[in-house]
Amino acid sequence: MPDFLFPNIPMPERQSKPRKRGLTMMIDWGLPLGLQKDCLEAQGLYVDEAKIAASIPRVMPKTYLKKKIDTYKADGIFAFPGGLFTELAIAQGNYELFLKDAKEAGFSGIEVSDNLLKIDPRKKKAAISKAVKEFGLTVMGEVGRKEGSMTKEELIADVENCLDAGASMVLLEAHELFHGDIRQEVLDELTKKIPLERIMFELPVVVLPDVTKAYKVKVLFWMIKQFGTDVNLANVEWDEIYFTEITRIGACGTTSHSQGAYRLAGIESSEE
């Protein structure tokens, strides 16, 4: 860990990298390499995973993509392409070729989702298993739809299916849980059955219609209050890393985190 100024202002401690919990996944919309390097020099200690989003790996020059992946890996960051790109490969019948290319590019793993493509649970399980067993890739399963929604029972069964197939962790699609009202009942039931360290909650992304930065921050505050500092969070933009970190430790202008810095300093919760 680096040295920090203000050593006389105590803060709640966090696990250092490589972390097993409290992971932060940064979403990369084609961040230029120079900015990526500056970003990681400043705040890479708070980034555990990086998703190069959507189908961006297909339109980025090969040598540049490899440099970006290598830069992440050099900082101990797990880099993988977005699940929508995987869905496109499956729909085209090019999944095995996609896995070969992902391996050749240097990605540590992939994401297997069914946001748009309706995949039979057995086929989804087979896709995850193939990537893990035949290609040695770490798989992030993803559960949830970008259009419509799943029942509580369907969502939990899908998470279990991904983990049974060999996924190291399951991402929960933000649209499924946080589009409009937060689906508290679904989250309560899910976290009773699945260990929190095997789940990563996506924050809403502001590139989607009707999603505002204010709403994303509201969801972030709620997640930390509900599940604590060590909840796994995805879809954090490069300029939100520090903000997310100080929110995790309850030092970001809200007293909602019972074990956060403000509350531990004796400041009463404004919600009580």
Task: Locate each region found by the language model.
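Conserved N-terminal beta1-alpha1 strand-loop-helix module at the mouth
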Residues: 1-67
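C-terminal alpha-helical cap/extension of soluble enzyme domains
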Residues: 5-13, 197-272
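Active-site-adjacent beta->alpha loops and helix N-cap segments on the catalytic face
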Residues: 7-13, 34, 58-71, 88-97, ...
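Active-site mouth loops of central-metabolism enzymes
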Residues: 19-34, 54-57, 80-94, 140-155, ...
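Hydrophobic faces of well-ordered beta-strands that scaffold small-molecule active sites
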Residues: 21-28, 47-52, 79-83, 110-112, ...
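Short, acidic/polar
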Residues: 30-43, 90-101, 151-161, 219-220
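Generic structural signal for hydrophobic
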Residues: 39-43, 72, 101-105, 131-132, ...
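A contiguous pocket-lining binding segment that forms or flanks enzyme active sites
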Residues: 157-190, 195
